[in-house]
Design a protein with these regions (language model features):
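Extracellular/periplasmic, surface-exposed regions of secreted and cell-surface proteins
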Residues: 1-207
Length: 207
């Protein structure tokens, strides 16, 4: 704090590894890992004007290397007009009037099934009896085949959400009556979905 100015800042680095016991597949038994860097910076002027900037730079194991990290910033502004000197004649009636707004980008890597951890890798069964071959006398011998239950997609990345908020806070009659109204906005993009049908002309399956 210096004079009528006040600032603050914070950086946080996190790294997490989670291991689960008694999993029924190799994929589930592998450690789950992610890491991220988050920051928060604020500024206030004379208890009237406020600004805040936040960011997250996060990495997820679920995506290919070139899509693994995402940058998600946000900012907010506030203005307490009732702290202005010209508002003093109105303080007995309306002792607080504040306008505020925020806007930011949020990332989500908890998409699809928790069993599908590595979207950039194929899921292959090299010993599938249902895809085998029969040969020999009266076709009495069988050799198991190979099946692919999922093809790799290196373009799958963070689900993103743009979020905004505009609000107003009122305090009247020495805060005997308080009113708060907010308008929220959200728009999601890059939503992961499983296709219900894939045409055979794509050549991804054979029966």
């Amino acid at each position: 704090t210096f004079g009528v100015h006040a600032t603050s800042g914070m950086l946080v680095y996190t790294r997490r590894e989670e291991k689960r016991s008694s999993e029924d597949t190799l994929q589930k038994s592998l450690p789950r890992r992610n890491q991220g860097l988050a920051g928060r910076f604020t500024y206030a002027y004379d208890s009237r004007c406020f600004a805040e900037f936040n960011f997250g730079y996060n990495g997820s194991e679920r995506f290919a290397a070139h899509e693994r990290y995402g940058f998600f910033p946000s900012f907010g502004l506030g203005y307490i007009i009732s702290n202005e000197s010209f508002w003093e004649p109105l303080l007995n009636t309306m002792d607080k009037l504040k306008f505020k707004m925020t806007y930011g980008l949020v990332g989500n890597d908890a998409i699809g099934s928790s069993d599908d951890r590595f979207y950039y890798l194929s899921e292959v069964n090299p010993n599938d009896g249902g895809r085998g071959q029969y040969f020999g006398t009266n076709y009495g011998n069988q050799m198991n085949g190979v099946s692919i239950s999922r093809y790799p997609n290196t373009n799958i990345t963070w689900e993103k959400s743009k979020k905004g908020n505009f609000g107003i806070e009122l305090g009247m009659f020495n805060s005997a009556l308080e009113v708060q109204a907010d308008f929220f906005y959200e728009r999601r993009t890059q939503i992961y979905q499983n296709r219900a049908y894939i045409p055979s002309t794509m050549g991804l399956s054979a029966g």
